[in-house]
Amino acid sequence: MASSSSSSSNSSTSSSALSGRLPGARSANPRKARILGLFDAIQDAVGPPKQAAADRRTVEKTWKLMDKVVRLCQNPKLQLKNSPPYILDILPDTYQHLRLILSKYDDNQKLAQLSENEYFKIYIDSLMKKSKRAIRLFKEGKERMYEEQSQERRNLTKLSLIFSHMLAEIKAIFPSGQFQGDTFRITKADAAEFWRKFFGERTIVPWKIFRQCLHEVQQISSGLEAMALKSTIDLTCNDYISVFEFDIFARLFQPWSSILRNWNFLAVTHPGYMAFLTYDEVKARLQKYSLKHGSYIFRLSCTRLGQWAIGYVTAGGNILQTIPHNKPLFQALIDGSREGFYLYPDGRSYNPDLTDLCEPTPHDHIKVTQEQYELYCEMGSTFQLCKICAENDKDVKIEPCGHLMCTSCLTSWQESDGQGCPFCRCEIKGTEPIIVDPFDPRDENRCCSFNDSLCTPMFDFDDDDLREECLIMNRLASLRKMNERQNSPVTSPGSSPLLQRRKTPPDPVQIPHLNLPPVPPRLDLIQRGLARSPCASPTGSPKSSPCMARKQDKPLPAPPPPLREPPPPPERPPPIPPDSRTCRHLHHAENVPCRDQSTPNEAWCTRDLSGGNQPSVCRVTHDGSPKLGVSSSVLNGRHSRVSTEAGFMRHKHHKRRESPLETHRVYNGLSGNEEYDVPPRLSPPPPTITIHPTVICPLLANSASDKVRNSAEEDDSEYKIPSSHPVSSRLPLHCHSIKHFPRLCENGQCLSNGAHNGISEIKN
């Protein structure tokens, strides 16, 4: 008797769970089931009721309903395909995550907080309703559930998608079982600002409230449009909009400034949009267009929420599906249409024109702070340089983590199936183009920008003022560079624009290692001003910053002390008699004498670069260029590096890559043939040496070498400038012949036009 009563109560409870309503209702009656389904739809349209507390008992009841759905879907007659969304994987994963959440809130106090959590209450209630709906679907559909093309089977697939969305949402709001909905990071900054402004730290809001707030920012034209919008945003179909669903909507129909316009074009009027469609259903739908190359449809990706999946028919009749990365959907469709992939939406001949959605998006500017500048200087790098390839400038920001890199590295990472951000492994939900504005210590105290300078009169300067003259040259060079970039077919800049900053050229007295003109008058001021201009160097990589032409394998110099005046230059040493020195001149058509730089002498002498005990032995290579044997000199406690001009060989132990086009360096307004971590102090110039291109005097070379060695040991604390002694072309008569190598003269430096296929050492 007791067993019969127990069985009757169990059957009554079971029927109550299946029907979802009155305990006395009979689920076997299809008419009543349809009425109850209509009642559910009306209640959903009216609005959600007040949620009860989601205590442990309620959660366990939901588990039982989920378990029943799993057992119904395990029927072999269904022949469910193991492809997303696979309900036999989704519901067990949901169950495991709920168990994880309860384990994190095991004591009574924490469990009470969890049961009163607004989002958790709504989630458990929605999960229970969806489970009951799935059970009722099996009860109503009966044998039609086993037909793949039936409407009941289609409804089961839609429920599977909803369960999949709910699983992704609970994992995002409760990562590792801990509630973090109040700190959830919305990917797009402007969308996040909207949510914070209207909803603060709330995790979920009713649809009616969300609609009113959205209408204040972007107008919703009609109630019909509002219903269609709700069906797009409300992925879990519970009449609430969570911060997770809002983030996905903002990513799908970006940018936020025109999000409703984009949504109307792509989801309302576009014939290629398919809502709640799976991978297999896309293939089945496009199968009838297998002979029509270019047919396509697109849907929300169920495995990567927030991204689109586009299915299309190839020229060979195959059906492929792809997920576009790092670009909005309308841009992907426009590009695919130009390339002949996306021509016929859902097989139709009319392909909507989406070019109206293409509006120039302003790039976010990231200003490098002084602390970042100094930190990266100590590491021998720059903030704007991509830390993965060390070649290109950072031009893209990963969202929501905010890490920066160059586009080529991000594309390569994603094509290699890299998961998440390469730096922090955070999920890549989106990207934004950015421009890094380098820090310039010379412009630190200036508020005017390059745009402001264009509006001010530029010709109120003194012709004798070198600073102002070079400043004008810099501006003209910047304008020319900017015009070249505007005429370039490349639309998206990969580096900082020239409009953002203006650099005053450095005082030539503060840069003693620049090539000085040999004799007055100084007609080369314009050329030298352009060469020193950070924006005028033509040797930078196309992908690098136009105001930061550099070689990637060398560190940036440390920031110079502000407002430090250099000491006055000392008097030049008296000229050395011609009979006690040797000279070298260049042999070319015009027989133009070169500037008496110390580099030719260093090619065959021993010197101490730092004034320490570690000499650096130089030798002449086959092309006549000097090559250091040992380089361990230190300038101000930091290692210096050897010149890497186009006519010079690289240092032995320096094996990083460098662009072959870069022959000139610009660092924070300082340019020169050698690079230092701080502005260098040059030793007094060695005696000028004259050597015929085909003969050399070894005896005089020894004496000259001693003089150079003695001059290098002088006190380097005083400020030195290069010498400009006259060049002697007289030759001693008693000299030994050596092999001649053809040489060129460029900017006062001796360059070889031969190949690096041998080494010729000059012996004393």
Swiss-Prot record:
Pathway the protein acts in: Protein modification; protein ubiquitination
Pfam families membership: Cbl_N, Cbl_N2, Cbl_N3, zf-C3HC4
Main location: cytoplasm
Limits of the Cbl-PTB domain: 48-356
Zinc finger (RING-type) residue numbers: 386-425
The keyword Transferase is assigned to this record: yes
Binding site for Ca(2+): 234, 236, 238, 240, 245
UniProt xrefs under PROSITE patterns: CBL_PTB, ZF_RING_1, ZF_RING_2
Record-level Gene Ontology MF annotations: calcium ion binding; phosphotyrosine residue binding; receptor tyrosine kinase binding; SH3 domain binding; ubiquitin protein ligase activity; zinc ion binding
Region Linker, annotated ranges: 357-385
UniProt-annotated location(s): Cytoplasm
Enzyme Commission numbers on file: 2.3.2.27
Residue segments, region 4H: 48-180
UniProt keyword RNA-binding present: no
Assigned keywords, A-Z: Calcium, Cytoplasm, Immunity, Metal-binding, Repeat, Transferase, Ubl conjugation pathway, Zinc, Zinc-finger
Region (Disordered): 1-27, 482-583, 707-726
Catalytic activity, as annotated: S-ubiquitinyl-[E2 ubiquitin-conjugating enzyme]-L-cysteine + [acceptor protein]-L-lysine = [E2 ubiquitin-conjugating enzyme]-L-cysteine + N(6)-ubiquitinyl-[acceptor protein]-L-lysine
Quaternary structure annotation from Swiss-Prot or TrEMBL: Interacts with several SH3 domain-containing proteins and with poly-ubiquitinated proteins.
Extra remark: This protein has one functional calcium-binding site.
Domain topic, free-text comment: The N-terminus is composed of the phosphotyrosine binding (PTB) domain, a short linker region and the RING-type zinc finger. The PTB domain, which is also called TKB (tyrosine kinase binding) domain, is composed of three different subdomains: a four-helix bundle (4H), a calcium-binding EF hand and a divergent SH2 domain. The RING-type zinc finger domain mediates binding to an E2 ubiquitin-conjugating enzyme.
Protein name in UniProt: E3 ubiquitin-protein ligase CBL-B-B
Organism: Xenopus laevis
Gene this chain is encoded by: cblb-b
